Amino acid sequence: MAPIELFQRVAATVPAYAAFLREHGVDAASIRTEADFATLPFTTKDNYTRRHPLNDLCRDGVLRGMIAVSSGSTGEPSFWARTADDEKVIADRFAQVMDGFGRRPTLAVVCFSLGTWVGGLFTLACVRHLQDRGYPITVVAPGNNPAEIARVLPQLAPLAEQTVLFGYPPFVKDVIDTLDLPWASYHIKIVTAGEVFSEEWRTLVAERAGIADPVRSFASLYGTADAGVLGNETPLSIEIRRHLAARPDKAREIFGADRLPTLVQYDPAVRYFEESGGTLLFSGDNGIPLIRYHIADEGGLIPYREMLDRIGFEPAQQGPELPFVYVFGRSRFAVSFYGANVYAENISVGLEQPEVNRAVTGKFVLAAPEGADGLHVTVELAPGQDPSDDLAEEVAARIVTHLRRLNSEFTHYVPERKQLPLITLRPYADPGDFPPGVKHRYVR
């Protein structure tokens, strides 16, 4: 993407951005080089999109297309406009994923929330664009309704050669764990968005769904309501991530953190990424065009060749020669305990170990009350599982073992006598901590 050309077009045609530039004393004609572009002030929800009427944020000040609502996971919901042309650009990312799965008769099952929320209808629209391109795909959209999924899959999945589940990671796992369906016979593939997950999670879900090759049967999408899908996992990025997951020191050297980020590849022809202070900015020509938009995602950029030079092995997977972007779970999904930042991703790995993973769902709530004798972790039990002291002790042991392995701050900052977490086991779908049908909050 040519950022200067995009900037000049947005400055000339988007009323809100023209006003933003005037407010910051920027003369659009003075922005001629990428160095000039890098001096432009960041745009954010607070200083830009929430300060202007929705139509003024659109091209030519005209609101058109479909309106989506962000999940509100970091605050109040926001509204975003997207046209069919915008969807067609994003559909290229879906095409790359589906090409990786193989072009054969496919049932696509949209398990994201439907309605005004961005995930379900946007995914449905992109899959329909693939149908228009000749992909042999049939799509059904039961949304995040397990009963409806159980009703349609037995009838439709046997008619296809593979079934692709599109959904939020914890929901997809819940569906596979709780619905008594012959998953292996459906030749399942899984596409997720909305949450960082561990490689232990990928392996566990693959085993339960009868997936033989987790590298070529999964894809996580990195996206936002603001701009749609920004990047996607490829078999190459998954192989690299799985290699680094088993080598925390090497991962720390490359990513500079005690947690494993989502690792995807992106197309610089349609998304312009920048890194600033360990966070990501992007620019793109969407239904609401955005310039140097700061979405508070922690992460960074690594060019394709640099990544292959740094990982220390020769990947078996051939991948597109596209740059990598890595994205951590947001810092608000962490707690500070004795000065150590403990991330939700660190806790997840412990719950995905074979000693406990059939007794729990993988969902939890992490807290570090002032003066506590240990981290407080409230864990959701699997359906039909009763709580017990023995299980709580085993969960605590798995969590602390992998916290020490993955998080050097925790190991060195937290006194050993306070490293064992305090576990509370709650029933499946407990309305207080684990209400069904809503996006789960891991830190409260």
Please provide the spans of the model-predicted regions.
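Nucleotide 5′-phosphate-binding alpha/beta core
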Residues: 1-107, 159, 373-422, 426-444
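A glycine- and small-aliphatic-rich helix-loop capping segment at beta-alpha/alpha-beta transitions
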Residues: 86-88, 126-128, 209, 238
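Phosphate/oxyanion-binding active-site loops and adjacent basic polyanion-contact surfaces
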Residues: 85-91, 118-120, 145, 167-168, ...
